[in-house]
Amino acid sequence: MGFTKQYKIDFDIIDNQIVLSNNYFQKHKGSFRKITGTRFGKVIGISEYETSLKTWANMVKIYEDEFDETLSRAGQVIEPKIRDYVIAKTGFNFHSYDPKEVKWDLFPENPVFGGIPDGEPVDVYGKLAYDTNAPMLEIKTTSCDSLVYKKINGNLKIVFDENGMPIVKKINGKKDSWFDSNGKIVISPAYYCQIGLYLYLRNITKGMFAIAFLEPQDYVHPEWFEAKQRDIRLVPVQIDRKAFEVLTNKAQLWYNSFIRTGKSPQLTSQDWEWLRENGIA
C-alpha cells in the first residue's frame, strides 16, 4: 500500500524529520500502534534491513506495509502445521490465538508494548501453563535456498520463472546463513528480541524457536506441506529479565520521543532513499 496519508497535508519533512500535522496528530494519536515483537528490533536499531523510520511511519498510520502475498500465504497455511508438529514432538500443548478475537494484542493493559506470540503452553483446561516450565513458542519459516527478489515500492517480492516457481539464486544459500562454522543455529538479535519482548511481558524467561526450512514448491503449494518431510529445528532460548529490561527501556524512550511527539527519528541516507522510492521528497 505504501503511504496512505497526504504529504504536505498530514505530514511534512522539517529539519530532517517527518513531522505530523497538528490536526492529524490530535485526531489520530489515540489510535497509534504499539511496539510489537516484530517492531522491537527495528525500534532499538538492531535490524539488518531497515531503520526505525518505516516502523515509525507504520505506527503513526501514515504508511502501510506491502506484504509479499506468496510469503504471507505460505506462513498462514504452513505455520499451523509446524505448531502441530512441535506439539507432537515436545508434548507441550501450544495454543495459538485468532488475532481478530484478541484485537491483535494480548497485552492491552500495556500502553507501549503489545502483540501476539505464535504459541503459548496451556493445560487441559486451556489455562496458561508456564508454571510447568513449558516454553513460549515462536515459529519461523525460511527458504532453504536463496531466492531472487525484486524491490517494488521499497518492498521485496519473490520473482517466479515461466513455470510459476520461485527463481533460485543459490541452493541452500539461505539455510547456510542460519548456521555458524560449527553447524550450530544462530538466532539473529532481531528474532531473539521478538520472542524476548513477549517473554518479558509474560514475566517468564524460557522460549523455543521452531525454524522450518522450506523448499521452493512450498511457496507455490503450501497446502501440500508435510512437516515430517522438511528440516525443522527446535531451538531453546532464554532471557535474563534484568538485562532485557535495558532494551525495553531503550524502546520506551524511543516511543516517548517519537510516537508521543508525532516527530520521527532523524532521517538517514537510507531513509531518504526509501522516501524517494515511495514518491516522497
Curated annotation (Swiss-Prot):
Transmembrane segments: none annotated. It comes from Mycoplasma pneumoniae (strain ATCC 29342 / M129 / Subtype 1) (Mycoplasmoides pneumoniae). This is Uncharacterized protein MG373 homolog. NCBIfam families: MPN551_DNA_bnd (NF045868). InterPro entries: PDDEXK-like_dom_sf, Restrct_endonuc-II-like, YqaJ_viral_recombinase. Pfam families: YqaJ.
